[in-house]
Protein backbone atom coordinates (compact mmCIF):
# COMPACT_ATOMS: atom_id res chain seq x y z
CA UNK A 1 0.00 0.00 0.00
CA UNK A 2 1.22 3.54 -0.64
CA UNK A 3 2.65 5.39 2.33
CA UNK A 4 0.23 8.30 1.91
CA UNK A 5 -2.73 5.91 2.21
CA UNK A 6 -1.36 4.31 5.37
CA UNK A 7 -0.67 7.75 6.85
CA UNK A 8 -4.23 8.86 6.03
CA UNK A 9 -5.68 5.72 7.59
CA UNK A 10 -3.61 6.19 10.76
CA UNK A 11 -4.84 9.78 11.10
CA UNK A 12 -8.46 8.71 10.66
CA UNK A 13 -8.17 5.79 13.05
CA UNK A 14 -6.88 8.07 15.80
CA UNK A 15 -9.55 10.73 15.35
CA UNK A 16 -12.90 8.90 15.22
CA UNK A 17 -13.96 10.47 18.50
CA UNK A 18 -13.12 13.93 17.21
CA UNK A 19 -15.02 13.27 13.99
CA UNK A 20 -18.14 12.39 16.00
CA UNK A 21 -17.90 15.31 18.43
CA UNK A 22 -19.81 17.72 16.14
CA UNK A 23 -22.60 15.15 15.80
CA UNK A 24 -22.93 14.89 19.57
CA UNK A 25 -23.07 18.66 19.90
CA UNK A 26 -25.61 19.13 17.09
CA UNK A 27 -27.89 16.31 18.25
CA UNK A 28 -27.83 17.68 21.79
CA UNK A 29 -28.65 21.21 20.60
CA UNK A 30 -31.50 19.99 18.36
CA UNK A 31 -32.71 17.72 21.20
CA UNK A 32 -32.57 14.64 19.01
CA UNK A 33 -31.84 12.34 21.90
CA UNK A 34 -32.28 9.12 19.91
CA UNK A 35 -29.47 10.08 17.54
CA UNK A 36 -27.47 11.52 20.45
CA UNK A 37 -27.57 8.18 22.31
CA UNK A 38 -26.43 6.27 19.23
CA UNK A 39 -23.53 8.65 18.60
CA UNK A 40 -22.60 8.80 22.29
CA UNK A 41 -22.40 5.01 22.59
CA UNK A 42 -20.33 4.87 19.42
CA UNK A 43 -17.98 7.56 20.75
CA UNK A 44 -17.65 5.67 24.03
CA UNK A 45 -16.66 2.48 22.22
CA UNK A 46 -14.24 4.29 19.90
CA UNK A 47 -12.73 5.98 22.95
CA UNK A 48 -12.44 2.66 24.81
CA UNK A 49 -10.79 1.09 21.78
CA UNK A 50 -8.37 3.98 21.46
CA UNK A 51 -7.39 3.83 25.12
CA UNK A 52 -6.93 0.07 25.32
CA UNK A 53 -5.34 -0.58 21.91
CA UNK A 54 -1.73 0.17 22.76
CA UNK A 55 -1.74 -1.65 26.10
CA UNK A 56 -3.53 -4.60 24.53
CA UNK A 57 -0.93 -4.80 21.78
CA UNK A 58 1.84 -4.60 24.37
CA UNK A 59 0.29 -7.32 26.52
CA UNK A 60 -0.61 -9.66 23.66
CA UNK A 61 2.65 -10.86 22.16
CA UNK A 62 1.06 -13.97 20.67
CA UNK A 63 -1.63 -12.10 18.69
CA UNK A 64 -4.63 -13.89 20.18
CA UNK A 65 -6.25 -11.79 22.86
CA UNK A 66 -6.32 -8.54 20.90
CA UNK A 67 -8.57 -9.99 18.20
CA UNK A 68 -10.82 -11.67 20.75
CA UNK A 69 -11.17 -8.45 22.77
CA UNK A 70 -11.81 -6.35 19.66
CA UNK A 71 -14.39 -8.83 18.33
CA UNK A 72 -16.08 -8.95 21.74
CA UNK A 73 -16.14 -5.15 21.88
CA UNK A 74 -17.84 -4.98 18.49
CA UNK A 75 -20.36 -7.63 19.49
CA UNK A 76 -21.14 -5.82 22.75
CA UNK A 77 -21.66 -2.56 20.80
CA UNK A 78 -24.01 -4.37 18.43
CA UNK A 79 -25.91 -5.94 21.35
CA UNK A 80 -26.35 -2.61 23.14
CA UNK A 81 -27.49 -0.87 19.96
CA UNK A 82 -29.93 -3.70 19.22
CA UNK A 83 -31.32 -3.56 22.76
CA UNK A 84 -31.72 0.21 22.58
CA UNK A 85 -33.34 -0.15 19.16
CA UNK A 86 -35.91 -2.58 20.54
CA UNK A 87 -36.57 -0.33 23.55
CA UNK A 88 -36.94 2.75 21.28
CA UNK A 89 -33.92 4.48 22.80
CA UNK A 90 -32.31 4.92 19.36
CA UNK A 91 -33.84 5.07 15.89
CA UNK A 92 -34.67 1.55 14.74
CA UNK A 93 -33.59 2.27 11.16
CA UNK A 94 -30.26 3.61 12.45
CA UNK A 95 -29.89 0.53 14.63
CA UNK A 96 -30.41 -1.80 11.67
CA UNK A 97 -28.02 0.10 9.40
CA UNK A 98 -25.44 0.20 12.19
CA UNK A 99 -25.73 -3.55 12.67
CA UNK A 100 -25.28 -4.17 8.96
CA UNK A 101 -22.20 -1.95 8.80
CA UNK A 102 -20.50 -3.31 11.92
CA UNK A 103 -21.25 -7.02 11.44
CA UNK A 104 -18.15 -7.26 9.27
CA UNK A 105 -15.84 -6.09 12.08
CA UNK A 106 -16.06 -9.11 14.43
CA UNK A 107 -16.00 -11.43 11.43
CA UNK A 108 -12.80 -9.76 10.22
CA UNK A 109 -11.28 -9.87 13.71
CA UNK A 110 -11.93 -13.59 14.05
CA UNK A 111 -10.81 -14.23 10.46
CA UNK A 112 -7.55 -12.44 11.23
CA UNK A 113 -7.09 -14.51 14.40
CA UNK A 114 -7.63 -17.81 12.60
CA UNK A 115 -5.45 -16.72 9.71
CA UNK A 116 -2.50 -15.74 11.90
CA UNK A 117 -2.48 -19.08 13.73
CA UNK A 118 -3.78 -21.65 11.25
CA UNK A 119 -3.85 -20.57 7.64
CA UNK A 120 -1.10 -17.97 7.22
CA UNK A 121 -2.67 -16.48 4.11
CA UNK A 122 -0.65 -13.74 2.47
CA UNK A 123 -3.63 -11.60 1.45
CA UNK A 124 -5.51 -11.48 4.76
CA UNK A 125 -3.40 -8.58 6.03
CA UNK A 126 -4.43 -6.48 3.05
CA UNK A 127 -8.09 -7.41 3.50
CA UNK A 128 -7.99 -6.60 7.20
CA UNK A 129 -6.12 -3.30 6.90
CA UNK A 130 -8.35 -2.16 4.05
CA UNK A 131 -11.80 -3.16 5.31
CA UNK A 132 -11.52 -2.17 8.98
CA UNK A 133 -11.12 1.56 8.23
CA UNK A 134 -14.07 1.37 5.82
CA UNK A 135 -16.20 -0.24 8.54
CA UNK A 136 -15.21 2.55 10.93
CA UNK A 137 -15.97 5.20 8.30
CA UNK A 138 -19.33 3.54 7.68
CA UNK A 139 -20.08 3.62 11.40
CA UNK A 140 -19.29 7.34 11.55
CA UNK A 141 -21.56 7.94 8.55
CA UNK A 142 -24.38 6.03 10.26
CA UNK A 143 -23.96 8.33 13.26
CA UNK A 144 -24.45 11.36 10.99
CA UNK A 145 -27.45 9.95 9.06
CA UNK A 146 -30.09 11.50 11.39
CA UNK A 147 -28.51 14.90 10.74
CA UNK A 148 -28.82 14.37 7.00
CA UNK A 149 -32.44 13.26 7.49
CA UNK A 150 -33.13 16.34 9.63
CA UNK A 151 -31.81 18.74 7.00
CA UNK A 152 -33.60 16.88 4.20
CA UNK A 153 -36.87 17.06 6.13
CA UNK A 154 -36.44 20.80 6.77
CA UNK A 155 -35.74 21.50 3.11
CA UNK A 156 -38.85 19.56 2.03
CA UNK A 157 -41.27 21.39 4.33
CA UNK A 158 -42.97 24.26 2.53
CA UNK A 159 -42.65 27.74 3.96
CA UNK A 160 -45.70 29.66 5.23
CA UNK A 161 -45.87 31.70 2.03
CA UNK A 162 -45.79 28.63 -0.21
CA UNK A 163 -48.45 26.80 1.80
CA UNK A 164 -50.83 29.76 2.07
CA UNK A 165 -54.05 29.49 0.08
CA UNK A 166 -54.17 31.56 -3.10
CA UNK A 167 -55.56 35.07 -2.70
CA UNK A 168 -58.74 36.06 -4.57
Question: How does the language model describe each region?
Answer:
Residues 16-24, 74-83, 135-150:
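Hydrophobic cores of alpha-helical transmembrane segments in multi-pass inner/ER membrane proteins
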Residues 31-43, 91-100:
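Membrane-interfacial loop-to-transmembrane alpha-helix junctions, especially the N-terminal start
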Residues 58-90:
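Alpha-helical transmembrane-segment detector that highlights a single hydrophobic TM helix
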Residues 1-21, 129-136:
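Hydrophobic transmembrane alpha-helical segments in integral membrane proteins
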Residues 102-168:
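C-terminal membrane-adjacent module
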Residues 51-60, 83, 110-121:
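Juxtamembrane "helix-exit" motif on the non-cytosolic side of transmembrane helices
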Residues 37-58:
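A generic, lipid-embedded transmembrane alpha helix
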Residues 4-13, 34-38, 65-66:
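Short, amphipathic, aromatic/basic-enriched membrane-interface segments that mark the entry/exit
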Amino acid sequence: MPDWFLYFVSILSKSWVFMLSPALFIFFIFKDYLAFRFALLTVAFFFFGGITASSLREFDGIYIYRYLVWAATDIIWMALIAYWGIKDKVYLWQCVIGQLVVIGAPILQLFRLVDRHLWDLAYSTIIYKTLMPFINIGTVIVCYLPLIMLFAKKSNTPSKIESAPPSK
